């Protein structure tokens, strides 16, 4: 019973990974659209895109860490 609840909790925690994947897709989609509109700002926009990617990926890593904590610690 407890093992099943742990698996369900870990599965629910990994749903955030799908949201992070969508967010990363939106970041780079916006980068492509912005560079297409103004190619002279490509280097500056790429830096902002990498920052957005890192922040979005950090949320995914926190969610993955929570899933592993649910599975192996609690």
Curated annotation (Swiss-Prot):
GO terms for biological process: proton motive force-driven ATP synthesis. The chain crosses the membrane at residues 8-28, 50-70. It comes from the Eukaryota. SUPFAM superfamilies: F1F0 ATP synthase subunit C. It is a multi-pass membrane protein. One of its GO terms (molecular function) is ATP binding. It is found in: Mitochondrion membrane. One of its GO terms (cellular component) is proton-transporting ATP synthase complex. InterPro entries: ATP_synth_F0_csu, ATP_synth_F0_csu_DDCD_BS, ATP_synth_F0_csu_sf, ATPase_proteolipid_c-like_dom, F/V-ATP_Csub_sf. Belongs to the ATPase C chain family. F-type ATPases have 2 components, CF(1) - the catalytic core - and CF(0) - the membrane proton channel. CF(1) has five subunits: alpha(3), beta(3), gamma(1), delta(1), epsilon(1). CF(0) has three main subunits: a, b and c. This is ATP synthase subunit 9, mitochondrial. It comes from Solanum tuberosum (Potato).
């Amino acid at each position: 019973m407890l093992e099943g609840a742990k698996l369900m909790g870990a599965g629910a925690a990994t749903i955030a990974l799908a949201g992070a994947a969508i967010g990363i897709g939106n970041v780079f989609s916006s980068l492509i659209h912005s560079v297409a509109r103004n190619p002279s700002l490509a280097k500056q926009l790429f830096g902002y895109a990498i920052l957005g990617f890192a922040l979005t990926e950090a949320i995914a890593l926190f969610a993955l860490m929570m899933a592993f904590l649910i599975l192996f610690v609690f």
